[in-house]
Amino acid sequence: SGKSTLLGALAGLLPGQGEVRIGGESLVDLSWPALAQRRAMLPQRQPQLFHIPVFQVLSLGLDEAQSAARQNEAIQALCQALELEALLARDFSRLSGGEQQRVLIARTLLQVWPSLNPGGRVLLLDEPLAGLDLHHQLALLRLLKQLAGQGLLVVLAIHDINLAIDWADRLLCLQQGRVVREGGVELVDEALLAQVFQIKTDRIEAGGRVWFMPSL
């Protein structure tokens, strides 16, 4: 617990102790428009009532200073990566929960998409994999890995420890709102999982990868 609160504080949306800096700038010194240029955040999914086509949902909030051609190029690239092309003309309110989640993820990504906002520094996603099937989880994780490789700091709150080990560079493990482990994925072990999740696990290694499975 505490993941959503931590992300909210990192985004400058919730008060917290200490100081958060993005690119050397303190959040408290940034105006709301400047903060929106530096970071984007997707909160945990809540019901949305957009009775408009998906392409309009994606266009909401885009910088009008950007050319329509550049905006459309970014939207098309995201829709291809997240497999949203077939949904662009559909009414957002009639989509399934998983489809809506993918659209909202794409909308958040557009806020810090490199070709539209070179000043984007941080992407915060709270449970972005919720409601997505395995195929679309993998598509999203591949895209996020690509963006991280281009210099964007990507912070995810997820529950699946095996996905975190596979895809993360660093882990921050919380228990009751307190940090109990921070560092590389190699720090995850059976003792940590027993402490945080109160379960016994078995470590499985194959093909250079590691999984932790609940003991039967």
Language-model features: where?
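Helix-to-loop junction immediately C-terminal to a conserved catalytic motif
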Residues: 11
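Conserved ABC transporter NBD signature motif
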Residues: 18-26
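Conserved ABC ATPase signature
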Residues: 91-95, 99-101
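Catalytic Walker B motif of ABC-type/P-loop ATPase nucleotide-binding domains
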Residues: 118, 123-127
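Conserved ABC ATPase "signature" region
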Residues: 72-87
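H-loop/switch region of ABC-family ATPase nucleotide-binding domains
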Residues: 158-159
